[in-house]
C-alpha cells in the first residue's frame, strides 16, 4: 500500500471473487456450475482464432463478442454482420485490441429484452440490495453504435417489480453467494 492510502477505508471483493467482474469467462463458467441463468457461450484464445471464426460462422447473428478482461467498458461488441464479427475477432484475438483483456474472447448468444443492473453489498453470506439501474451503453441515439465507457444510467427502473426482484434473488443472488461458499471463495 501507498502510505497515504493506509487510513482510507474501502470495501470490495478479494482478488479471487473479483474475477466475477474481471473475467467474463470465469463468471460464465461460475454461473454454469451453479445453475445461474446466462446466455450460451464459448471462450476462445489467440491460439484458437480459426476455431473461433468457425464457431461464429456456425451461429446466427447478431454476434456478441466479449473481451474476457476489463476493457474500460468497451470490450463488448454486438455485430449484425458476420464479416464484421470475423474482423472483430481478428482485432481482439489476433491483434490484441484490448491487450491482455482480449487474450481470451467470449462469444455469446445474443439475448433480447430489457436489461438492468442489480447491485448488492455482501459479506459473502448476507447482502443488502442497492437501487437497480438501467445504463445506456451505446454512443448513438436509440442505443446504436459502439459501446462507450459509460454514458449514463436511470434509477429506479420501472420494470423492476417486487416479483422481478424476487426472481433475481432466487436465480442470481442466492446461487452466487452459495456458489462462492461452496467453492471456498471468500468475498471480503
Language model features with spans:
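A short alpha-helix-loop-beta-strand transition element characteristic
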Residues: 10-14, 35-42, 61-63, 97-104, ...
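Short gly/pro/ser/thr-enriched loop/turn and capping motifs at secondary-structure boundaries
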Residues: 16-21, 71-72, 137-139
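Short acidic active-site motifs
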Residues: 50-52
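CheY-like receiver
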Residues: 54-55, 88
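Conserved anion/nucleotide-ligand pocket segment
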Residues: 60-82
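Internal nucleotide-binding/catalytic subdomain
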Residues: 75-188
Amino acid at each position: 500500500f501507498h502510505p497515504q492510502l493506509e487510513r482510507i477505508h474501502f470495501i470490495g471483493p478479494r482478488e479471487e471473487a473479483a474475477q466475477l467482474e474481471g473475467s467474463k469467462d470465469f463468471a460464465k463458467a461460475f454461473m454454469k456450475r451453479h445453475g445461474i441463468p446466462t446466455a450460451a457461450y464459448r471462450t476462445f484464445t489467440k491460439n484458437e482464432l480459426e476455431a473461433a471464426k468457425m464457431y461464429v460462422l456456425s451461429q446466427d447473428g447478431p454476434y456478441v463478442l466479449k473481451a474476457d478482461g476489463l476493457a474500460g467498458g468497451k470490450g463488448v461488441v454486438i455485430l449484425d454482420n458476420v464479416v464484421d464479427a470475423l474482423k472483430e475477432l481478428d482485432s481482439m484475438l489476433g491483434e490484441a485490441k484490448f491487450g491482455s483483456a482480449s487474450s481470451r474472447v467470449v462469444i455469446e448468444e445474443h439475448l433480447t429484452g430489457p436489461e438492468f443492473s442489480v447491485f448488492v453489498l455482501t459479506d459473502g453470506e448476507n447482502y443488502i440490495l442497492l437501487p437497480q439501474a438501467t445504463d445506456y451503453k451505446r454512443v448513438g441515439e436509440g442505443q446504436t453504435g459502439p459501446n462507450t465507457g459509460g454514458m449514463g444510467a436511470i434509477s429506479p427502473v420501472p420494470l423492476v417489480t417486487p416479483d422481478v426482484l424476487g426472481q433475481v434473488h432466487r436465480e442470481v443472488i442466492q446461487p452466487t453467494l452459495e456458489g462462492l461458499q461452496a467453492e471456498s471463495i471468500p468475498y471480503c
